[in-house]
Amino acid sequence: MMRQSRQAVLPEISGNKTSSLRKSICSDLLTLFNSPHSALPSLLVSGMPEWQVHNQSDKHLQSWYCRQLRSALLFHEPRIAALQVNLKEAYSHTLAISLEIMLYHDDEPLTFDLVWDNGGWRSATLENVS
């Protein structure tokens, strides 16, 4: 079965609307990560339960995880023009990722850090997004 790609025609954005867009993207991504019925693969949504049963130091697993996450986010978030996913920490009880995001009509990269904490994802950078 072929997957349909979604393309969005986005309006030009300037000034303080860019800041609002960046905050909106981060807020929407955090909601997506914490949604129990998210369309993201289960490892990406529930994070730690599945992560703990695997060898977290396995570089192939880490690479696979980043590729899966990148693919899912690009599919579900049409406002992202380019995305790089990096694992910052990958231990049995800690999973921290960093998303380097380029948005359409925004020349500055957006860095969004997420940490799996007490059964859910949280962001240390959401309040600092501008």
UniProtKB/Swiss-Prot annotation:
Q: Per UniProt, what is one GO molecular function of this protein?
A: anti-sigma factor antagonist activity
| SUPFAM superfamilies named in the record | gpW/gp25-like
Q: Does the keyword Transcription apply?
A: no
User: Could you name the domain of life of the organism this protein comes from?
Assistant: Bacteria
Cellular localization per UniProt: Cytoplasm
For whether the record's keyword set contains Aminoacyl-tRNA synthetase, the answer is no
Q: Which GO terms describe its biological process?
A: cellular response to oxidative stress; DNA damage response
Short name of one Pfam family for this protein?
GPW_gp25
Q: Tell me which UniProt keywords the record has, alphabetically.
A: Cytoplasm, Stress response
Q: GO CC terms for this protein?
A: cytoplasm
Family listed: Belongs to the GpW/Gp25 family. IraD subfamily.
Can you state the subunit structure given in the record? Interacts with RssB.
Describe its function: Inhibits RpoS proteolysis by regulating RssB activity, thereby increasing the stability of the sigma stress factor RpoS during oxidative stress. Its effect on RpoS stability is due to its interaction with RssB, which probably blocks the interaction of RssB with RpoS, and the consequent delivery of the RssB-RpoS complex to the ClpXP protein degradation pathway.
Protein name per its UniProtKB record: Anti-adapter protein IraD
